[in-house]
Amino acid sequence: MITDEHPFEFAPQQDEYTQLLTELHNEYCAEQPLDVLQFCSNFFIRKLEEQRLEHRNNHHSRNNLFDTNDTSNDLHPLCEQPQEDFSQQQGIQWETTHMGHPNDHGALHDDDDDPLEDEDDEEFDKFSTEPLPSLPPTNYNRGRRTSVKCREHGTQRQPRLCQGHHPQISGTSERIKVSISNNFLFRNLDEEQYLDVVNAMSEKRVVKGTTVIEQGSVGDFFYVVESGTLDCFIGQNKVTNYEAGGSFGELALMYNAPRAATIITTSDSVLWALDRNTSAPSLMENTSRKRRMYEYFLSEVVLLKSLESYEQHKIADALESVYFEDGQEVVKQGDVGDQFYIIESGEAIVLKEENGVQQQVNQLERGSYFGELALLNDAPRAATVVAHGRLKCATLGKKAFTRLLGPVLDILKRNSENYHAVINQQS
């Protein structure tokens, strides 16, 4: 048993990573905290603060570049103050960042921040003249030039979605509305929230061959394509493409996560960019909650387990839940099909009519899917599916079915070649 009397060590020669883990483990053994997660969090935050302080002191002593005197009490203590422009001192032509004044909610906005600019770390942005708070902001990114939105202590979340607006010229709002009309992020917004989103978007015109986002980088923008075409790469492999009405970058918007893919324009394109720092939490929380719910559900569907996580993300975003009462027909034999169904909860009965006689051929439960044959073959429904008790299904339209289920279409087609598989899998 490892105790504080017998310190834990990984190896005789330790790098920074193993040294940190060793120190954490020894402190844990010495203190035996009840809340392990909080203890670990406090440990790493403390170490980060110590490192930042050491860097700041060393850098100040060498170059005297930073003024550590607190000259303003206007900002919320968690908000990051504007960094100085060091381009003249270092002989490097950096693009100057013009930071706005804090608004009523203590937020700073980068007035001229271009979402298509290089998002790589800048050396001098690694140091802040503000002491590290006890807990970092949720959108904290080490070494990045960011605009941090903070909520005052004791205040309630504002109902308005977006606090950063770009007043749209005549006709621009209509263009944005057309571009986002079918986007999953904005389906459930009320009128006021919808207008806030429209006013928060900025137009970006990019030429052919432009890398809009790069895999692994940290980004703040979500993009909707108004016109043009773009290719999506994971590593060196092209996985999909985008055209008018398509969107990408939602991981940055919802989770502040690194870019999952690289997007490159294949023609001159017009994009609408939405900054995560001007998007209120309620928009992101609603979408994130829906995605988490569907991702958990999709992980139980055998057909979809082979999909990559980004593919499951896209499917989860496109799914919509529908409900049926006991005895209600979900699909009817002979009808034209335009929806694919996956059962979320409840049961359904598959009925097939032959020679004027209808008989039950299968019973479906959670995780079962049906409706794919009509979409694969542009054929009428092959059977009738009826709710057996209250039934909840996740649905996917025909276009989304073809676009998002590409990796499993071969599996579906192989199943459809066998009559018995058809009866077991599909109406």
Swiss-Prot record:
InterPro entries: cAMP-dep_PK_reg_su-like (IPR050503), cAMP_dep_PK_reg_su (IPR012198), cAMP_dep_PK_reg_su_I/II_a/b (IPR003117), cNMP-bd_CS (IPR018488), cNMP-bd_dom (IPR000595), cNMP-bd_dom_sf (IPR018490), RmlC-like_jellyroll (IPR014710). It holds the Pfam family cNMP_binding. One of its GO terms (molecular function) is protein kinase A catalytic subunit binding. The lineage of its organism: Eukaryota, Fungi, Fungi incertae sedis, Mucoromycota, Mucoromycotina. It comes from Mucor circinelloides f. lusitanicus. This is cAMP-dependent protein kinase regulatory subunit. SMART domains: cNMP, RIIa. One of its GO terms (cellular component) is nucleus. Belongs to the cAMP-dependent kinase regulatory chain family. The modification Phosphoserine is found at S147. Residues 96-145 are annotated as: Disordered. Residues 38-184 are annotated as: Dimerization and phosphorylation. Tetramer, composed of 2 regulatory (R) and 2 catalytic (C) subunits. In the presence of cAMP it dissociates into 2 active monomeric C subunits and an R dimer. 3',5'-cyclic AMP 2 binds at residues 303-422. The gene is pkar. 3',5'-cyclic AMP 1 binds at residues 185-300. It comes from the Eukaryota. Residues 110-124 have a biased composition (Acidic residues). Keywords: cAMP, cAMP-binding, Nucleotide-binding, Phosphoprotein, Repeat.
